[in-house]
Amino acid sequence: MNTDKKSDLLSVLSVANVMEHIRYSVAACQTDSSNPIDRRGMRANTERILSMIDSAVAGAAPFLPVRLIVFPEFAHSAPVFPTAAELHEKLAITIPNEHTERLQQKAREHDVYIQSGSMLESDPKYPGHVFNATCLIGPSGILYKYRKVNTWIPYEVHTSPHDLPDYNEPLFPVADTPIGRLGCAICYDWLFPEAMRQLAMNGAEILIRVSAYMDPWGATDPMDWWTVINRARAIENMAYVVASNQGASLKFYPPYSWPGGSQVVDFDGRLLAQASPGPGERIVVAPVDISALRHERESRRGHHMLSHLRSEAYPTYKAHQYPPSLSNEPPSYETNNTRIDEAKKHFAQRSKTDIS
């Protein structure tokens, strides 16, 4: 073979490697575990999560292998105490920790990526504050940490990182991995299309939902906000959605019941897989085709909302709606309600001004 032909062949092979088709299965796992009231109690939940990872991998092994496994909000720990001080004292942990280390070992064992269930996080940089956090963990370790931006107020008393005046970390991180570009948001975040749009604009191809979505808004008629939101966000952002919902029974997580219904949705809003509604452990698996998604994003001209967005047409986003925190103190039920009242007054005044 002459030098020119050999060079051409190497070029073709190089392009083929770059264009390698990325297709695999994802698993949305929902848990039904007791609610720990201390750090020691978290270990049993983590052990069950590790076992479910083994099951997800084994179940898909004869078919399209699983490469991404997602767990729900509160899978490790939940805000069972009414104040940030109690959560900080009894449940909050720093990241990384023994749980993320165990997950990394499992990710390395199976060559998978794991979106952890959420855990209550403390950080010495922000004394007294507690975050609702989840990590994307791969064989090499933690790829990003996401802290819930839109906390479920007034009840949730963990801190939104957005509210800390000296916070300088990315609010919506995205990880570029061999299985695609992944980004995550937690539960109530998903009712704000702006959050998912920011992840997509940051490059996310799979939008991961770590959630504890309760009745009556959950995964069943007549409301079924769960499915409506998941499908809408997939369509709006031309992205896959892997949504893991809490499947705990009422006795574990009162005062709400948890409808499960974990889902996988494709970038056109098609429901690829869904767990049956109702409490209980479930693992739902579906294929995702990142190469097909990239082709659509590159070639599609119609219904390409990411590129058609006229962001400057929406000046409402230049001003605050929900008021910024005026204190560096952790939130409480009372201060959350005060800020909600202020935000509602601001909205009413602003609406009248805009109409006139």
Residue ranges: model-predicted function:
Residues 26, 128, 132-144, 261-273:
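Short, glycine-anchored, charge-dense loop/turn motifs used at functional sites
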Residues 30-32, 72, 147, 210-211, ...:
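Residue-level recognition of beta-strand->loop/alpha-helix junctions
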Residues 43-50, 54-139, 143-145, 154, ...:
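Cys-nucleophile CN-hydrolase/nitrilase-fold catalytic domain and related Cys-dependent amidase chemistry
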